[in-house]
Amino acid sequence: CMWYDTPRLLCQLEIEYTDGSTELVVTDDSWKTTTGPLLHDAIFTGEEYDARLELDGWNRNGYKDSSWKKALLVRAPKGSLHAQLAPHEKIIRILQPVSCEQKDDSTYWYAFPEMISGWAHIKVQGNAGDRIKLRFVGEEKNDFGQVDLYTLRGGGVEQWEPRFTWHTFRYIEVTVSYTHLRAHETVLDL
């Protein structure tokens, strides 16, 4: 995140098995790291995701992570650590656009029925390396830097939605890098 310094993780997983036994998993020098498809995220301004960099199976048992680097132990941030309890974000309804206007060969303007906070779920088809830019615009026609970028993996229909951001908007300007891209669906998750 642009406002948080170097990315860090402090984690403690408390696992309780069905037989009643427990296991504690904590961050230490046995953890590994690598780059992936999420190139940038900022809660208020958006995400950049390159699907060509996805690591198939990385989250399944038996994945070969021999090329991954050991995570570095780093200094703790200043201040004291306190638990923060907050409700998780959840989808309460899904909106379809009320209109779509093609501005030129590569730009589309989607209008939604009201100003909302949420994110877009896209379903597209194109070639590896094709890019989609989603610019989220409010009623006053200002985007306040709210942009999501998605680079296609290629090879079929792809679906994507950001995981670490949400936007406040009424319109989405969608710009595609190539005119052969096919938008199958654009919906809003609120």
Across the structure, where does each feature detected by a protein language model lie?
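Extracellular/oxidizing-compartment recognition motifs
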Residues: C1-R182, L188
